[in-house]
């Protein structure tokens, strides 16, 4: 039994968070660009979103392995539900990015307009830990 920590778990979590932060930052930059160029800019971000999904799945596997080494089987399902939700949100993001890049009617990310507003004197134009950690923009 190792007490030094699970470096596979730590690396996979770090890779997932770092990639998610880069994706959020680049999505904001793409949305702040010229409206006519937004679809192509989002299309170029699809590989980064897919990279995040890959890291998220690696973290899921590493977390499951760590859990079974150190805990009883019950209890894991609550974390599995959360991670499955995060995975599905990411897959939906990729679908929406593809639709926007293909200029499908009704596609886009109008919620980013709200995100980029200055609220209560706080500049919301950068990714914050709270939005990233809780995977929504309303926190």
Regions found by a protein language model. Name each.
Residues 1-139:
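Catalytic domains of carbohydrate-active enzymes that cleave complex glycans
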